[in-house]
Each structure stands twice: as structure tokens, then as C-alpha cells.
Regions:
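C-terminal transmembrane-bundle signature of multipass membrane proteins
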Residues: 139-221
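N-terminal topogenic module of multi-pass integral membrane proteins
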Residues: 1-70
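Non-cytosolic membrane-interface motifs at loop->transmembrane helix junctions
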Residues: 62-74, 122-132, 175-186
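Juxtamembrane "helix-exit" motif on the non-cytosolic side of transmembrane helices
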Residues: 22-24, 54-62, 112-122, 164-176
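Membrane-interface helix-boundary motifs at transmembrane edges
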Residues: 22-38, 89-100, 142-152, 206-208
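Aromatic-anchored segments of alpha-helical transmembrane domains
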Residues: 44-51, 105-116, 156-170
Length: 221
């Protein structure tokens, strides 16, 4: 059953990545950057899940284990923060220079290494994932009266990805680092987050033709 959970997660994440890709067309540069960041988040989780699937089927080696650990750690610390930030960005109609998304990813990686060096990794792990969950919840509140589909998806995602860890007393998204029965909770969480990003990207204020009121933000009212 664990292998099936990871296989389904891999397939859904890959499919959602293919679904998100064409939604970049017609979006302004910043919105395309948010979609690209979301694709990075989904693909990191997909690669980690794929390697865990192979491991469950007995197709493991030292090189594969090392690769899985790298992608697993990256997905644990980058995927949810990027998805949460992307939903807030698209929900508010913010306009950053596209390069800022690359800087965000590099910043998350640098802070992870610093947290390991200082021995603060568990605290940093919780911090970045709670920030991602907070971003999704904020987007749910913003769209509660505008589009209940988006609000519902932004609520389902953090509940599925974070809530189970509160009861099991584990770090968030540990099922992306090692094979666990709790992997089944990841599927609805990542699916909901990806769908929310896609629907938010289609909002009028994120189109290439939308005229920003200034260079930094264009918030929906």
C-alpha cells in the first residue's frame, strides 16, 4: 500500500505539472515566475516520491538513496513554502521582477544550510513549512467571498500537509524523505495546492494585459 501511495503521488504531481505549464501563457512576467516556482515545488516532490517508489519495489542503490535524500530534503524545505508564497502572490496580484523567485529559492536553500550548521534544522523546518501553510490559509481568506473553489483548495492543502504531523509529533513532510504510511496525506494536499495555483493564475489581474497601478502590487478588491 505504501508503494501504491507513492506511485499515485508521483503520477498526480507529474500530471499537475503538465497541467500548470500551459497556464503560463498569457500571464504577466511575475505570474509566470510564480507558476515556475510552483512547478519547481511540485517536481521536487515528484522526484522524491518517484525514488521512494523505486525503493519500495526493491530497485535501490547507494546512488539512488543519496539522490532521494537530496530531493527529499529539498522538497521538505522548499515545496510548501513556494506553493504558499505563490498562492498569496497570485491571489493579491503582486508584481515582482521574475528574478526574485530564483532569489527566494536560493535563499531557502542557503537558510537550510545555515540551520544545519547552527543546529537549528528542526526549528527551521517547522518555520518554513508553517509560513507556506499560512500563505495558503491567507489566500483562502482572501478568496472566501470571491471564489469558494479556490478558498476550499487553499484550506485543504495545509490541513492535509501539516495537520497529520501535529498528531504524530513528526516534522512536516517527513514522508518525502523516507517511506511512511503517512504519504497518503500528501496526495490531497499537493493536489489542492497545485489546483489553487492554477486557478489563481487564471484570475484577470494576473493576465498579461492587466495594467498594474504601480510597480509592486495590484491587489484585488
Amino acid at each position: 500500500m505504501i508503494a501504491i501511495s507513492y506511485l499515485l503521488l508521483t503520477l498526480f504531481l507529474a500530471g499537475l505539472s503538465l497541467w500548470l505549464w500551459p497556464r503560463r501563457v498569457g500571464r504577466h512576467a511575475g505570474a509566470r515566475g510564480a507558476l515556475n516556482a510552483s512547478l519547481v515545488a511540485l517536481l521536487l516532490a515528484a522526484l522524491s516520491s518517484l525514488l521512494l517508489t523505486f525503493g519500495q519495489w526493491g530497485a535501490s542503490s547507494a546512488a539512488m538513496a543519496d539522490a532521494q535524500r537530496i530531493f527529499g530534503l529539498a522538497a521538505q524545505h522548499i515545496s510548501l513554502p513556494l506553493l504558499g508564497l505563490a498562492t498569496v502572490y497570485l491571489a493579491r496580484g503582486l508584481r515582482w521582477k521574475p528574478m526574485i523567485w530564483g532569489q527566494v529559492i536560493l535563499g531557502l536553500m542557503a537558510c537550510f544550510e545555515l540551520s544545519r550548521y547552527l543546529g537549528w534544522q528542526p526549528g527551521y523546518h517547522w518555520l518554513v513549512n508553517l509560513i507556506g501553510a499560512a500563505g495558503l490559509l491567507a489566500s483562502a481568506v482572501l478568496y472566501l467571498s470571491r471564489d469558494k473553489r479556490i478558498a476550499g483548495l487553499c484550506l485543504i492543502a495545509p490541513v492535509s500537509l501539516i495537520a497529520p504531523t501535529l498528531f504524530s509529533q513528526q516534522l512536516p513532510l517527513t514522508a518525502l524523505l523516507s517511506a511512511e504510511a503517512g504519504a497518503s496525506w500528501l496526495l490531497p494536499g499537493f493536489v489542492a495546492a497545485a489546483l489553487a495555483v492554477g486557478l489563481l493564475a487564471e484570475q484577470a489581474h494576473n493576465s498579461d494585459n492587466a495594467c498594474p497601478s504601480n510597480d509592486s502590487t495590484t491587489a484585488p478588491r
